[in-house]
């Protein structure tokens, strides 16, 4: 029997675990165990699923173990996934059956593709990508590792999104052109509902229509 663990028993974990449960049943039948892994909630049950600590998950005597990280914070997601990979646990990609992934598309390990997501042709997506409900990635896009698309985020064609970027709910990224893509830099944050019409430097937060850098108020002394 194999053991499958969803790291993070919070909101996205609770949304994701039934998708994985359905996926495993279709692929493997009924001979498996599926749990949450969450050190804060260990020993409890969440939505009917047992919650294990990380240590208990790693020590559990199963034939094979698989995992995914349903934690929205990209830095925590990266830290957890890198740690668990060091223990030889295999990441599993989770894909809802009504999502659409076109041919000639490459998606890295550990992705979560939620309901009503579309990923178009000739796209390349890195590891542990989160595509939340009703988001889409259009043709010829390059998406890095640990990128998050919140619900309804829309990325049009010929866009490069670098590692650890966050695309907020309802945000729209304008298409680039061949050999001159629009670029969202590493760690950039695109705010909810933003309309991005030009490249965004690494580490910058933008919001509005058209999207502009969000300036911090001066700290009072």
Curated annotation (Swiss-Prot):
The keyword Transferase applies. GO terms for molecular function: acyltransferase activity. The active site is at 139 (proton acceptor). InterPro entries: AcTrfase_PglD-like, Hexapep, PglD_N, Trans_hexapeptide_repeat, Trimer_LpxA-like_sf. Signal peptide: none annotated. Its EC number is 2.3.1.227. It catalyses: GDP-alpha-D-perosamine + acetyl-CoA = GDP-N-acetyl-alpha-D-perosamine + CoA + H(+). Pathway: Bacterial outer membrane biogenesis; LPS O-antigen biosynthesis. Keywords: Acyltransferase, Lipopolysaccharide biosynthesis, Transferase. One of its GO terms (biological process) is O antigen biosynthetic process. Optimum pH is 8.5. Pfam families: Hexapep_2, PglD_N. Catalyzes the transfer of an acetyl residue from acetyl-CoA onto GDP-perosamine to form GDP-N-acetyl-perosamine. Belongs to the transferase hexapeptide repeat family. This is GDP-perosamine N-acetyltransferase. It comes from Escherichia coli O157:H7. The gene is perB.
């Amino acid at each position: 029997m194999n053991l499958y663990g969803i790291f993070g028993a919070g909101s996205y974990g609770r949304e994701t675990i039934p998708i994985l449960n359905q996926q495993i049943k279709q692929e493997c039948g009924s001979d498996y165990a599926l749990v949450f892994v969450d050190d804060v909630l260990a020993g409890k049950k969440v939505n009917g699923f047992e919650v294990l600590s990380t240590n208990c998950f790693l020590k559990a005597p199963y034939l094979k173990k698989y995992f995914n990280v349903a934690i929205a914070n990209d830095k925590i997601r990266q830290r957890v996934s890198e740690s668990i990979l060091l223990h030889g646990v295999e990441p599993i990609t989770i894909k809802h059956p009504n999502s659409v992934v076109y041919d000639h598309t490459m998606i890295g390990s550990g992705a979560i593709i939620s309901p009503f997501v579309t990923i178009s042709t000739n796209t390349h997506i890195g590891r542990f990508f989160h595509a939340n409900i009703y988001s889409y990635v259009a043709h010829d896009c390059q998406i890095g590792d640990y990128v998050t698309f919140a619900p309804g985020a829309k990325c049009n064609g010929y866009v490069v999104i670098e590692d650890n970027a966050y695309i907020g709910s309802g945000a729209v990224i304008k298409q680039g052109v061949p050999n001159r893509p629009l670029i969202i830099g590493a760690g950039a944050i695109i705010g909810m509902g933003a309309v991005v019409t030009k490249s965004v430097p690494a580490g910058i937060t933008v919001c509005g229509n058209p999207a502009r850098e969000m300036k911090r108020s001066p700290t009072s002394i």
